[in-house]
Amino acid sequence: MSSRPSSAVPNSASLSEDQSSDRSKFPKADDLIDERDRKLTELYCVSRLNQLLELTDENKLRKEIDAFLKKNDIRRGIRFDEASLPKLLHTAATPITKKKLKDVNLINVPNQRLSDSKMSRELPENSENVSVKSESHFVPSHDNSIRENMMDSLRPAEKTGGMWNKRPLESTMGGEEERHEKRQKMQSQSLESSNNSEMASLPISPRPPVPNALAHYTYYENIEYPPADPTEVQPAVKFKDPLIKNIMAKEIDTSDHYNENNVDALETVFLLMNDYIPSKIPQALPLAELKYMSQTLPLINLIPRAHKALTTNIINNALNEARITVVGSRIEELRRLGLWSLRQPKRFIDPWKQHNTHQNILLEEAKWMQADFKEGHKYKVAICTAMAQAIKDYWTYGEICCVKRKTLLPGKENKLSDDGRISEKSGRPSDTSRNDSDISIAGKDDIGIIANVDDITEKESAAANDNDENGKNEAGAKSDFDFADGLLSQEGAHDQIISSIDTKLLLKKPSSSSEVVLIQHEVAASSALIETEESKKELAPPFKLSIFVDELNTFEKTLIQDLPLYNGINEERPKKDDSLPFIPISKSVVSLDDNGFYKLLERQLIDEEPSISQLSKRRGMFYGNRRNHYLRPPAVPSLRYLQNRTPTIWLSEDDQELVKNINTYGYNWELISAHMTHRLTYSYLSNIERRTPWQCFERFVQLNERFNFSDLKGPRAHSAQQWLIEAHKFQQRQNRRISPLGVNTESIQRGHRRLRWASMFEAIRKCMKKRENTPRPNPTQPRKPLDCKNMKVPTPAEMSLLKAQRDEALRRDIQLRRTVKNRLQQRQQQSQQAHSSRAQSPIPSNGKSSSNLARNGQASAPRPNQKQYTEQDIIESYSRKLLEQKPDIGPEMALKAAKNYYRTLREQQQQLKQHQIQQQRQQLQEESSHVQQLQQLQPGSQAPPPKSSPSQSSLSNISNINSAPRIKSPTPQEILQRFQKQ
């Protein structure tokens, strides 16, 4: 072993030099090695994923990962070995040991840094322990005393002291465990021999030694054998308070028909039916709905698009749907032919059953014996229970609970009578047997009789009372209880009958307890003499062997009124073979052939009226589980018909039919109206019997107590709400109700047929009035017939000429319209320019221009009769316009908005005027400079043309100013918006 490290050192040094040279040659090798180390780290962590909750020391985990990477370091030429990965260990210990392992850390030795030489020597010896330690995991703890005790308990017993109290686990694990351990040892030795020198120089996470006993309690999981099912353990109780348990417990859905918390229940009924009849029908879909769905959206077309992978169960669902569709179509076909009904045909009577054969007689006898054995067993159980209760009562209360029997006179022979009483001859005393606790009777003349225990007890109690009170009845009964000999005897005088009970073997008590026994018997006797209800209940047998009708209450009498009784096997045959052996007492009881046990089912009747259950729940043919929360009213009639309409009579049957149709068809008022109108022929239908969609809707609103206007949806919701409000107001003003509730068919004013004939006269009057108001044709005007003979078919040339003439007429018409439109536009522009020039005063540029403007502007001067508006007038006019368009705003706000707008408009006009004056000055300067340049260029030429006077230029500029677009007056709406923005 000493030569191996010396030879391994130079090899490792040369290997490291080669790796460094390769690393310089291949710069990407480091990246590949790092990627490999990262994946190995992930693999190591995944293999220890089951220890995730138990890993608390991060530094220790890092050291273990570093050691694992060094074992599989490719830089040293070591390939990855799967055996170096940690494996899951299962501790095969007792439940107590498992509990201790959960709370106590078995191995917690402080980390010790070993020297290189010491580690190199101990590595091959502890390689197995190190591998086992890497695979085991424990919960950390700080209790050293508990840890030491647990270590002592896990140490194996010495062989010198004896054999193991338990069989070692290796003997049961088989050869698989041994081969695995050998392979692990060989791998650890090969690892040590190849990299002993490097591992000696590198720091390895110190691992504490594992006791040898741990190897006997660990085994590796074999993949070939399936894991055992875990044992179900009841969870710990979270809440001790029963109230909190009831609140936090989950409600269990029961299949009973009775729910005490159901507010929709009207009443409770009791159903009596056979035990094998299901009390609740399973939830299913109607055949019509299933057939409709299978034809419109079959599963065979939907399944391939809804699932990525098709299985047998999924395909079977589609096949079952096809089968059910075929069955449903066959049922519909039979119903059309009249061969399908809920009532089945008459039961077929087999003619062979009318003859009694040996087999029939044998079956009847077997049936009789079965019933006899069953009832006999019940009777024996009841009798045994009654006897056991009697013995228990005797030893509890004493002789007072015995049955009273008639006393027999002495001197006569008593034989065994028919009722089972024991009799003996006179002059022979009865032999007493102490072992069997028989009753020994001793008298003055030694005559043995059977005495009445209750009579004797009464006499004894009377004698005892006399002795206590007076002390003079020496001839009375004297009781002497001798507990030393174990014999209970009584002696009497004057030929009094005395009875004694031998309790030597059964009651062996000291003499001090005799008083307690006497008190117990006396109290029981006194309480039994006073017949109370409590004493009767205590002495009552546990089973009632008989029952009388008087003991039942009214509800129980109703249940058993028609209940068939079990009479055994009737020897007499019924006269009619097709008659059933029992009479059904309810519609829920199916008429079957034989009797059986009955079950009592308590069921609630649920109210399906609109007051409790919302009518928005559709219970129709299709989509019965879909809820519709929106109520869309039908077409609303005009309000002008409200005062003159005739009342509509709704009977109670009509209301029931209306609710039924609403549950079936939802809020489809047209369909409901069609089903409510029972019109067999095209005869006259009065307004009282007519059921329009709006009348059905209005009646629904009256019946629904929880109706709210917010439930109305759709475009007709507002008009329907207005109608209902006006109808309610009108109905309050009337003495009679428009649609009375609960109308009786015999009421002449509301539901009698005479109202129908009275309404017919009103309908005739309306038809006559309508016929009178219709316009009649005028026969005086002759009708001109069409002249078909004089009509001539035009030629193509004539057709083209007509088209050209028509186009030319259209062109002229369009041109004429354009010219007229242009003339109107010119006139409007001229009038606007003239109006603007009159409204604005001229702006003088100098003295000459002002004089000229005064001369030329005489026509544009304001007339004396024209009214001049001040600033306050303009502001008030604006405020009035604002109040007219928006009456919601106050006058103060309108006045402020008008003032603000007038100021801003005035500022804008001043800015515009200043801008125009500046432009005029710039134009004048440019013209003067242009004239000077022309004079300099042509000094010898003729005089320039006469220059326009400044007055003319100013007039032209003023005209341009007047012709410029003015600021348009805004609307009051714009004024208010600007004020609100500011």
From Swiss-Prot:
Instruction: Look up keyword DNA damage and say if it applies.
Output: yes
Predominantly, its location class is nucleus
Annotated GO MF terms: chromatin binding
Write down the superkingdom of origin: Eukaryota
Residues annotated as carrying Phosphothreonine in the record are T971
| Residues recorded as bearing Phosphoserine in the entry | S841
| Stretches with biased composition (Polar residues) | 1-18, 842-871
Domain Myb-like span(s) in chain numbering: 642-704
Q: Where in the cell is it found?
A: Nucleus
For this UniProt record, the keywords arranged alphabetically read as follows: Activator, Chromatin regulator, DNA damage, DNA repair, Nucleus, Phosphoprotein, Transcription, Transcription regulation
Region called Disordered, residue ranges: 1-31, 115-143, 157-207, 414-440, 768-792, 822-872, 913-982
SMART domains, per this entry? HSA, SANT
Low complexity: bias regions: 186-199, 825-841, 913-941, 949-965
Q: Does the keyword Nucleus apply?
A: yes
Residue ranges of the HSA domain?
Answer: 346-425
What does the entry list under GO cellular component? Answer: NuA4 histone acetyltransferase complex; nucleus
Q: Which family does it belong to?
A: Belongs to the EAF1 family.
Q: How does it assemble?
A: Component of the NuA4 histone acetyltransferase complex composed of at least ACT1, ARP4, YAF9, VID21, SWC4, EAF3, EAF5, EAF6, EAF7, EPL1, ESA1, TRA1 and YNG2. Interacts with SWC4.
Purpose: Component of the NuA4 histone acetyltransferase complex which is involved in transcriptional activation of selected genes principally by acetylation of nucleosomal histone H4 and H2A. The NuA4 complex is also involved in DNA repair.
Q: What's the protein called, per UniProt?
A: Chromatin modification-related protein EAF1
Gene this chain is encoded by: EAF1
